[in-house]
């Protein structure tokens, strides 16, 4: 049985790489609507879109979503989630799942999975997902975040660099993945407890988070454990660029 949880979908209009991204149309609908529809297919008790832009509020209201207007000055999507959790009055132990607003094909099963994993691991303040890396180009791609975990499935660290660095194997050959090293790609979906979100904001960013531009490192820096599991179903990939948008359009529009 899936744990009770709320989904929050952060949707910013002013993306530096792709402004207006949540409202780009795919199969005749704004992208944020497709994300919302996928989240509504999960076991979530409630699905809320969080945005800092009135244009996105208007679009979300038009297709019937619950939407909250948040401040514009948040350092990260997790900071925005903390404001939403406070606005909704969620209990400290309530589970909140962050579904990125640029994942129009996110499988509902992985939304349920990340919530259930957090409920099953009270020692963790967060949970997230990963999948194996089977391509050496992905290992060296800084846009693909790598994760290493301990024997209990708790994150040791995340990095945009190859992680771990197979010293001898990569010194000899960087054209193939080192044999026997279980490289994993982080999938950017998270579940949190609402009380943790309050703590996360109060800590503020750390130098490691700022250096890698990875907000989950703030949690590790402050001693919070992050549970990581392999995704039951691999998400097909989000929309970071106009090229990604065209790829998703081809998939969904036929």
Curated annotation (Swiss-Prot):
Enzyme Commission numbers on file: 2.7.7.38
Any GO molecular function: 3-deoxy-manno-octulosonate cytidylyltransferase activity
EC class of the enzyme, as a word: transferase
Keywords (A to Z) from UniProt: Cytoplasm, Lipopolysaccharide biosynthesis, Nucleotidyltransferase, Transferase
Family matches, as InterPro entries: Cytidylyl_trans, KdsB, Nucleotide-diphossugar_trans
GO cellular component: cytosol
Principal location listed in the UniProt entry: cytoplasm
Signal peptide span: none
GO biological process, one term: lipopolysaccharide biosynthetic process
SUPFAM superfamilies on file: Nucleotide-diphospho-sugar transferases
Record has Ligase as a keyword: no
Pfam families, sorted: CTP_transf_3 (PF02348)
Subcellular location: Cytoplasm
Domain of life: Bacteria
Pathway of action: Nucleotide-sugar biosynthesis; CMP-3-deoxy-D-manno-octulosonate biosynthesis; CMP-3-deoxy-D-manno-octulosonate from 3-deoxy-D-manno-octulosonate and CTP: step 1/1; Bacterial outer membrane biogenesis; lipopolysaccharide biosynthesis
Record field: catalytic activity: 3-deoxy-alpha-D-manno-oct-2-ulosonate + CTP = CMP-3-deoxy-beta-D-manno-octulosonate + diphosphate
PANTHER family: 3-DEOXY-MANNO-OCTULOSONATE CYTIDYLYLTRANSFERASE, 3-DEOXY-MANNO-OCTULOSONATE CYTIDYLYLTRANSFERASE, MITOCHONDRIAL
Role description: Activates KDO (a required 8-carbon sugar) for incorporation into bacterial lipopolysaccharide in Gram-negative bacteria.
Family the entry assigns: Belongs to the KdsB family.
Protein name: 3-deoxy-manno-octulosonate cytidylyltransferase
Organism of derivation: Pseudomonas savastanoi pv. phaseolicola (strain 1448A / Race 6)
Gene name as annotated: kdsB
């Amino acid at each position: 049985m899936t744990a009770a949880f709320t989904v929050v979908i952060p949707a910013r209009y002013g993306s530096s790489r792709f402004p207006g991204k949540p409202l780009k149309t795919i199969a005749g609908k704004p992208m944020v609507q497709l994300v919302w529809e996928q989240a509504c297919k999960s076991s979530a008790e409630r699905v809320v879109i969080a945005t800092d832009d009135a244009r996105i509020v208007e679009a979300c209201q038009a297709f019937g979503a619950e939407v909250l207007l948040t401040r514009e000055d948040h350092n990260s999507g997790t900071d925005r989630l903390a404001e939403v959790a406070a606005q909704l009055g969620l209990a400290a132990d309530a589970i909140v799942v962050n579904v990125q607003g640029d994942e129009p094909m996110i499988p509902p099963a992985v939304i349920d999975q990340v919530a259930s994993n957090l409920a099953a691991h009270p020692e963790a303040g967060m949970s997230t997902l990963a999948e194996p890396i089977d391509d050496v180009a992905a290992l060296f791609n800084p846009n693909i975040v790598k994760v290493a975990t301990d024997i209990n499935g708790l994150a040791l660290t995340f990095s945009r660099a190859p992680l771990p660095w197979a010293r001898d194997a990569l010194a000899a050959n960087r054209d193939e993945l080192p044999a026997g090293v279980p490289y994993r790609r982080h999938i950017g979906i998270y579940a949190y407890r609402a009380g943790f979100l309050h703590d996360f904001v109060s800590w503020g960013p750390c130098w490691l988070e700022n250096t890698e531009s990875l907000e989950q490192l703030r949690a590790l820096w402050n001693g919070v454990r992050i549970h990581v599991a392999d995704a039951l179903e691999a998400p097909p990939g989000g929309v970071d660029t106009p090229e990604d948008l065209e790829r998703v359009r081809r998939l969904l529009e036929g």
